[in-house]
């Protein structure tokens, strides 16, 4: 049996301000830092250890991972950063207040954008400064690979190839893996590992800074799933 640990980043500044974040690179709050440290303490107290780590290229997930590893005295562990573990891209909603957006477009429409499986928010227009095209961390990616908006389905479609290419082979080789990422990219992994339906995964909540543990058999099928 192998244990895989997933952790959503600690509370971010835009989580606190109730803004759509997506690919916007925002900092952790003091609470978010405390959540990450507490996660490391829980993992350490429960006897967890790791051989390899994965995270996105967004600093709220990177810093959460670093804080967890620092608390566990494991900052030396190898870490792979990949854009495919980024949060779902929220398109034209990024930077907008969720309550104000609901007042403008209607609660039902915003709920569809946020919680439907295959309906994305409005895309960012060409030339918008929020587009990731000129960002160095995405150098080498084609314009087609970089989203202007994403549904959860789109997010899952980029997360799963990374799982199969980079994470699953490490687990099969006996490595203990920790993944620090985002609510929707982690939903993609949960949907795949647990075999959840589109309806089930859109309602599955992953709190900030709380480790989600999978116990996997030799075929990487889950035998248990629980929050620490």
UniProtKB/Swiss-Prot annotation:
PANTHER family associated with the record: PHOSPHOGLYCERATE MUTASE
Domain of life: Bacteria
SMART domains per record: PGAM (SM00855)
Chain's role: Catalyzes the interconversion of 2-phosphoglycerate and 3-phosphoglycerate.
Protein name per its UniProtKB record: 2,3-bisphosphoglycerate-dependent phosphoglycerate mutase
Reactions listed under catalytic activity: (2R)-2-phosphoglycerate = (2R)-3-phosphoglycerate
Organism: Rhodospirillum centenum (strain ATCC 51521 / SW)
Matching CDD domains: HP_PGM_like
Residues that coordinate or bind substrate: 8-15, 21-22, 60, 87-90, 98, 114-115, 183-184
């Amino acid at each position: 049996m192998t244990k895989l640990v997933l952790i959503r980043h600690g509370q971010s500044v835009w989580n606190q301000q109730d803004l759509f974040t997506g690919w916007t690179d925002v900092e952790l709050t003091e609470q978010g830092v405390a959540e990450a440290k507490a996660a490391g303490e829980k993992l350490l107290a429960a006897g967890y250890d790791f051989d390899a780590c994965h995270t996105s290229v967004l600093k709220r997930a990177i810093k959460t991972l670093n804080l967890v590893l620092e608390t566990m005295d494991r900052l030396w562990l190898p870490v792979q950063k990949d854009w495919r573990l980024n949060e779902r891209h929220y398109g034209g909603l990024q930077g907008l207040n969720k309550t104000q957006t609901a007042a403008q477009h209607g609660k039902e429409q915003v709920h569809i954008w946020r919680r439907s499986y295959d309906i994305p928010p409005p895309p960012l227009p060409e030339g918008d400064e929020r587009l990731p095209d000129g960002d160095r961390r995405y150098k080498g990616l084609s314009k087609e690979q970089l989203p202007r908006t994403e549904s959860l389905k789109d997010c899952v479609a980029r997360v799963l190839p990374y799982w199969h290419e980079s994470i699953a082979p490490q687990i099969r080789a006996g490595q203990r893996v920790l993944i620090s990422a985002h609510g929707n990219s982690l939903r993609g992994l949960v949907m795949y590992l647990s075999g959840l339906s589109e309806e089930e995964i859109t309602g599955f909540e992953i709190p900030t800074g709380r480790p989600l543990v999978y116990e996997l058999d030799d075929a990487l099928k889950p035998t248990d799933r629980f929050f620490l």
